Amino acid sequence: MRILAIDPAIRNTGYAVVEGDYRRARALDYGTLSIPRSVSQSGCLLAIKQHLGNLIDKWNPDEMAVERIIYVQSHQTAITMGAAKAAVVIAAAEAGLRIMEYSPKSVKLSVVGRGAAQKTQVAFMVRALLELRETPESDAADALAIGLTHLFSADPLKAHMMERKYI
C-alpha cells in the first residue's frame, strides 16, 4: 500500500510518501513545503493544495493519512490550522483518496511506544524504522510517522491502540 501522509500547517506542511505494510515500510519521498511569510494566507492554501496535487499525480497513493489537530495556542491558530487542513482534505477529495486521521498521541504511541514521546524521539524512531541515512527535519519526520502509523494500523495487534477516524 502506498500512503501520502501529511502534517498540516499553514507555513510548513510536512509530507511523506511511504509504501509497505505493517511489517515493512520504506520512504519514497518526504520533506516540508515551506512558504515564506510574505505570501498571504490564501496564497498558502493554494500552494498547499497545488503541492499535494502534484505529489498525488507523481506518486499515485492509495490513501492519505493526516494528523488530527488537537492542541492550539489560540482561536486564530485554530482557524489557520483548520484552513491548512481543509486544503489538504480538498486535494485528497479531488483525487478520490480515502483520508484517515490520527491523533498525535496515537502517532507517537505507534512509532515510539509512548503517547507522550518527544519530537526528537519520534524523528529518531522514524529514521530507524525506515532505515534513513539522516534524521529528517521535524515536519517531515512527523509526516513520516503519520504514514507509518497508517501502515501499522493494519496490524491486528496494534490497531486497537490507535485513535483514528475516516474524514
From Swiss-Prot:
Residues forming the catalytic site: 7, 67, 139
EC number(s) given by UniProt: 3.1.21.10
Example of a GO MF term: magnesium ion binding
InterPro entries found in the cross-reference section: RNaseH-like_sf, RNaseH_sf, X-over_junc_endoDNase_RuvC
Function in brief: The RuvA-RuvB-RuvC complex processes Holliday junction (HJ) DNA during genetic recombination and DNA repair. Endonuclease that resolves HJ intermediates. Cleaves cruciform DNA by making single-stranded nicks across the HJ at symmetrical positions within the homologous arms, yielding a 5'-phosphate and a 3'-hydroxyl group; requires a central core of homology in the junction. The consensus cleavage sequence is 5'-(A/T)TT(C/G)-3'. Cleavage occurs on the 3'-side of the TT dinucleotide at the point of strand exchange.
Subcellular location: Cytoplasm
Single Gene Ontology BP annotation: DNA recombination
Keyword field: Cytoplasm, DNA damage, DNA recombination, DNA repair, DNA-binding, Endonuclease, Hydrolase, Magnesium, Metal-binding, Nuclease
Name of the gene this protein is made from: ruvC
PANTHER family per record: CROSSOVER JUNCTION ENDODEOXYRIBONUCLEASE RUVC
Pfam families, per database record: RuvC
Residues reported to bind Mg(2+) 2: 67
Cofactor: Mg(2+)
Protein name: Crossover junction endodeoxyribonuclease RuvC
Lineage top rank: taxon: Bacteria
Catalyses which reaction(s): Endonucleolytic cleavage at a junction such as a reciprocal single-stranded crossover between two homologous DNA duplexes (Holliday junction)
Record's subunit section: Homodimer which binds Holliday junction (HJ) DNA. The HJ becomes 2-fold symmetrical on binding to RuvC with unstacked arms; it has a different conformation from HJ DNA in complex with RuvA. In the full resolvosome a probable DNA-RuvA(4)-RuvB(12)-RuvC(2) complex forms which resolves the HJ.
Keyword DNA damage annotated: yes
GO-annotated cellular components: cytoplasm; Holliday junction resolvase complex
